[in-house]
């Protein structure tokens, strides 16, 4: 996408960043990140919800290959939360699963900060 920039990092670093942020958004349902990261994260998260809404084995395996194997709580992992809770929550919605709320700029480097949260 045009709004994600390299910032001196390679593709593996950016992919790992998006995988971690996607997993954390599923677990916490809200994150405070920079505006550029939030816009890129929205694209990956929407794809995960689309896979969860499909619900077949192939979709589950695709999502498992992207998400980190982290416990969302004592009973379920992030993948289980995605397929069991979030897929049902968004089954009648065709997109736009997140909202981005602007905050003040970060104090150290004046980067535009936002909160990305699930609707």
UniProtKB/Swiss-Prot annotation:
Keywords: Ribonucleoprotein, Ribosomal protein
Xref: Pfam families: Ribosomal_L17
Gene3D superfamilies: Ribosomal protein L17
Domain of life: Bacteria
Single GO molecular function: structural constituent of ribosome
TM helices/strands, residue ranges: none
Coiled-coil residues: none
GO cellular component: cytosolic large ribosomal subunit
GO biological process, one term: translation
Keyword Ribonucleoprotein attributed: yes
Description of how the protein assembles with itself and partners: Part of the 50S ribosomal subunit. Contacts protein L32.
Similarity section: Belongs to the bacterial ribosomal protein bL17 family.
Classification via PANTHER family: LARGE RIBOSOMAL SUBUNIT PROTEIN BL17M, RIBOSOMAL PROTEIN L17
Protein name: Large ribosomal subunit protein bL17
Organism, scientific name: Mycoplasma mycoides subsp. mycoides SC (strain CCUG 32753 / NCTC 10114 / PG1)
Lineage: Bacteria, Bacillati, Mycoplasmatota, Mollicutes, Mycoplasmataceae
């Amino acid at each position: 996408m045009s709004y994600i920039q390299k910032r001196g990092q390679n593709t593996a670093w950016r992919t790992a960043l998006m995988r971690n942020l996607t997993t954390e958004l599923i677990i916490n349902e809200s994150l405070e990140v920079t505006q550029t990261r939030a816009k890129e994260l929205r694209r990956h998260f929407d794809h995960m919800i689309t896979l969860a809404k499909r619900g077949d084995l192939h979709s589950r395996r695709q999502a498992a290959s992207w998400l980190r194997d982290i416990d969302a709580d004592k009973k379920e992992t992030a993948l289980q939360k995605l397929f069991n809770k979030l897929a049902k929550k968004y089954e009648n919605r065709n997109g736009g699963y997140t909202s981005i709320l602007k905050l003040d700029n970060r104090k150290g480097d004046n980067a535009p900060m936002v909160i990305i949260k699930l609707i």
